[in-house]
Amino acid sequence: MDFIRMIEEEQMKKDLPAFRPGDTVRVHVKVVEGTRERIQAFEGVVIKMKGGGLRRTFTVRRVTYGVGVERTFPLHSPRIDRIEVIRRGIVRRAKLYYLRELSGKAARIRDRR
């Protein structure tokens, strides 16, 4: 068991910012198109964090042209270039699935000071 934990710790990223559900983040993802590789930003609200250790994932939601888009990222993925925390939000839940049903001003999240 120690051997598996040791290998996982080697592959974990150390330079990740602290964020939690309710925070607005910008995730810079490496995208491969043919032979070229570029970085694409995905900005939205973190609605869920799941798992632990190397298997930890988080889901980011944003609304684009009236359509809600959710994307789930492995936290320690080599495809993630960097994560920026734009705003910190106050929420009382760990999973913010209720935001899927809300739109406009009702979907706002208060700022943490």
From Swiss-Prot:
Key word Ribonucleoprotein present: yes
Transmembrane residue ranges: none
UniProt entry keywords in alphabetical sequence: Ribonucleoprotein, Ribosomal protein
Molecular function via GO: structural constituent of ribosome
Coiled coil: none
One record GO biological process: translation
PANTHER family named among the record's database cross-references: LARGE RIBOSOMAL SUBUNIT PROTEIN BL19M, RIBOSOMAL PROTEIN L19
HAMAP family, per database record: Ribosomal_bL19
Family label: Belongs to the bacterial ribosomal protein bL19 family.
Protein name (Swiss-Prot/TrEMBL): Large ribosomal subunit protein bL19
Lineage: Bacteria, Bacillati, Bacillota, Clostridia, Eubacteriales
